[in-house]
C-alpha cells in the first residue's frame, strides 16, 4: 500500500524533492499529438510560467524543471528559513495572490483597523497559510489545478487531467544527499535529449538547463562568476562552512556535467567514456558507468527516495518505516 504524502515528504530528513505529474486521457500536455495532429506546444509556456511564478510565492524554490509532451518534472527545495522569517502580513499577502482569502484577512491586508477578536482570527489564519507556503503538496495542487482548468477549457471537456497518483496527481521522490541531488538535476535537465526532442542542453526549450545557460551567456567578460537566473535556486559552490542556501555545486561544474552526459547519451557512446571526468563526478566519487545508468533510469532505480544506502536508512528510521526500501547500487 502506498505511503501517504506526509510519510514521503519530511523537511527534517531532506529539503529536496523530485516531483512528476503525468496526463490522462491519452491527451498530450504539450507538443504535437501524433494521433490528432493537433499542436499543444503553447501549453509548455503555461506550465513553465506557472512553475516559476509559484516559486516566487511559496517558500519553495525551484531547482530544476523540464516540460515534456505528456508530463513534467520539477525539483523543489523547501526553504524553511524563509518560511519562518516571513511576517504574518507577508504570509497573508502571498497567499492572497493565489486565493481570495476571507473578509477579515482582506481588511487586515488593506490596513483597516481590526478588533482584538479579528486580530486573533488573522493570526490563526496566518499560521495555517504559513504552513501551506512550505508544503509541496499545496505547491503541486495549485500548479496542477491551474493547468488542468486551462487545458480542459481549451479541450472543451471536463474530468481529470492528471494521473491520480496518491493525492494531488503527482509522484514524489526524496533526494537524500548530494549524489542523489546531482543525479536527479541532470536526469530532469536532460529529459529532452533522452527523448530526442533536443540536441543539446541549450536547445532544450522549457527546461531549467536552458535558463541556466541563457543567463550564463549574459555574463560580462570581467565578472568573477557566471550570471544565474534569480527565479531558480542558485548554485553556491562546493560544501563549506557557513554556506548560504543554494545548490551545493559550482554552476560551471554542473554545466560541464550536463554537456558531458548529454553528448554520451545523444550519441550512445557508453562504451567510450572520456577519461577527463567532470569535477562533480570526481568529488562525489560516482563511477561514470553507474552515473549514466542513473541519469537514464532515475525514476526506475529509485521509488519514493533516492540516495546512498546510509542516507536511505537514516530517513527510514526518521520516518518510522518498518523496512528499508530496495536501493539502487548506483548511489551506494
Regions found by a protein language model. Give the residues of each.
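Short catalytic/metal-binding and nucleic-acid-binding patches
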Residues: 1-332
